[in-house]
Design a protein with these regions (language model features):
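N-terminal secretory signal peptides
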Residues: 1-51
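Bacterial lipoprotein signal-peptidase II cleavage site
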Residues: 51-64
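A residue-level marker of the well-folded mature domains of exported/periplasmic proteins
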Residues: 67-391
Length: 391
């Protein structure tokens, strides 16, 4: 089904920071912020790899889990991130999800987000909001799961109205060192659906039968996204091949430019999808230089189609389900370590608008295939797994 063998840039993978009481439990994959802090250590070995990632608020809700039973008239929400709200990717996507949630939740007030939060400062940043009795503290990524265990445990006793929402985190594997998950929930998007949506667009838009993907780091979510991306594209045309790199980091646009330029030259890539924030901006520069009429980009995780992005034909959009978390805080049902799933059924995963470079015929086919992706019938788990095992 793959049509080609794959090789990838080999990079180091660092384990999550675990608490002292359970360091021996397991080692898990490096998180997004650690990749940013460590920089692009493998950048000099620019290896190319060929082959072929809201509800409405209640008008009469309880005062969350404080147990008072009285109606709360206002709520505060705060966001902590490793990057900035204008990164064009990960943190901007979270920030826009929060703004959308606020539009339908008039009782809520957003405090100033904490940007560029270093690993050493993550717990302190959260504690600052705990001390203000902020109702919902959002951590943009699984790195915060490894940093907040002690803060959460203390807050559960001393600030029972404070709740924590950590995105891109599986509580069953990434929060085993927590003393309590009572005030915690996480969000997990359907990465298979995201990748498949990008894959059908790539499969329908490519003329050279060669598509590319850049990931910031080799996370399980990144591997699932790429595997579904290639599987869906090959469902359109089994001869399509994929080029990938999972070690690009999230900050160096020039690396994205260089990778994409080489893939265009050596592998004739004409469609790209990325999961690497600023690096994706560099990839788009290379596509534009090669010709925006023939080289296309699928953006992620926000909708950026417009005149200032001539290569972007559509976007895979992730909503981080913050509105649902707000509803649960208001009703008193938030917590217990539940994982909120974002998918095509609840608006957590979607495609953005199309550029005028996408024909009506292609748009109609994308719509048809999207319904199959939503129903789980377009690609199988086995097809995705077969590709993922080869990476």
């Amino acid at each position: 089904m793959r049509g080609a063998t794959c090789t990838s840039l080999n990079g180091r993978r660092k384990g999550h920071i675990m608490s002292e009481i359970k360091k021996s439990l397991s080692a898990v994959m490096l998180d997004r912020r650690q990749a940013i802090v460590l920089g692009l250590g493998g950048m000099g070995a620019l290896a190319l790899a060929g082959c072929g990632g809201s509800g409405s608020s209640s008008s009469s809700s309880d005062s969350s889990s404080s147990g008072s039973g009285s109606e709360q008239s206002s709520y505060k929400v705060a966001m902590i991130m490793s990057g900035i709200i204008t990164d064009g990717g990960w943190d901007q996507g979270h920030y826009e999800s929060l703004k959308r949630a606020l539009e339908s939740h008039p009782k809520w007030e957003m405090l100033e987000p904490k940007e560029n939060t270093a690993d050493a400062d993550a717990a302190t940043a959260a504690q600052t909001y705990v001390d203000q009795d902020v109702d919902l503290i959002i951590g943009n990524g699984n790195q915060f799961a490894s940093d907040w265990a002690e803060v959460v445990a203390d807050a559960a006793d001393s600030h029972p109205k404070v709740h924590f929402l950590i995105t891109n985190t599986d509580p069953t594997t990434e929060m085993t060192d927590y003393e309590t998950l009572d005030p915690v929930e996480t969000v997990l998007p359907d990465f298979k659906q995201t990748g498949a949506l990008a894959g059908v667009v790539a499969g329908l838009m490519t003329k050279t039968k060669s598509i590319g993907f850049i990931g910031g780091m080799k996370l399980p979510s990144t591997l699932t996204k790429y595997s579904a991306y290639l599987a869906a594209a090959q469902k359109i045309d089994p001869s399509i091949q994929g080029q990938y790199n999972f070690e690009a980091g999230f900050t160096d646009a020039s690396l994205g430019t260089n990778l994409t330029q080489q893939w265009i030259t050596l592998n004739n890539v004409d469609v790209m999808w990325g999961d690497a924030s600023a690096v994706d901006n560099g990839a788009r520069q290379a596509l534009e230089a090669a010709g925006a009429d023939t080289h296309f980009d699928i953006a992620q995780p926000i909708d950026i189609v417009g005149d200032d992005q001539p290569t972007v034909v559509t976007s895979t959009v992730t909503d981080w389900m913050i509105g649902q978390a707000m509803d649960e805080v208001e009703s008193g049902s938030f917590g217990g370590g539940k994982a909120i799933t974002g998918n095509m059924d609840n608006g957590g995963i979607s495609l953005g608008k199309f550029s005028d470079r996408v024909s009506k015929d292609v748009q109609d086919k994308v719509k048809e295939y999207s319904e199959q992706i939503k129903a789980g019938t377009f690609i199988t788990d086995d097809e995705v797994s077969t590709i993922q095992k080869s990476l």
